[in-house]
Amino acid sequence: IMLADPEKNQAYADLVLQHVEKENYDGVILDLSDNTGGDMGPMLAGLSPLLPDGTILFFQDVAGNRTDVQLAEGSLSMGGSAVQGSKTKVQSVPIAVILNERTASSAEIVALAFKTAENVKYFGTPSAGYTSGNSQLRLYDGTILQLTTASLVDASGQEYMNVPIAPDESSDNPLRAAVEWIHAQ
């Protein structure tokens, strides 16, 4: 999702929150296949009840300096549009994340954020590999130049610089594999 309107960004996060905050499910399947990215802020805010508070990933510059992306009570620091998520945390449930070769950019950031959660397993095929942090520079004529300025580092310390995220279980039918895994938990 890439919306320039803060109200629409918040509305997107709120719509996701309506479904995530329900407590009548035994597991979550987060299907990021074909999600080509956009703004990580609304996506992470909407999914914030499923993520633990704290550092969810890092941006690392060429000198090795890291800037952490923090989630605290539904608010995200250092990444995407300022959107408010939820302070409520959902009970611990198994979370299946589905990836494919079209899971890209901020959708890959969302996938990496779930490496901080417990009982998560990744299914499908490797992601697109647009795993980097970008900065925007507005030029004199209003044109925006997007520059890759950082790699991504997940909570375990693994660095991703334009490399795909590999699933834990490769599958031609990742939805079925995810459902079977959740039922087995």
Label for each model-derived stretch:
Residues 1-58, 75-76, 183:
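Flexible, low-complexity junctional segments that flank or bridge functional domains
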Residues 1-3, 31-35, 60-62, 98-102, ...:
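Active-site-proximal beta-strand/loop segments in catalytic clefts of secreted hydrolases
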Residues 10-17, 40-48, 92-95, 107-111, ...:
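Extracytoplasmic/secreted envelope proteins and their assembly/folding machinery
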Residues 37-94, 132-136, 145, 149-155, ...:
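Gly/Ser/Thr-rich loop/hinge elements
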Residues 124, 130-140:
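C-terminal soluble interaction/assembly domains
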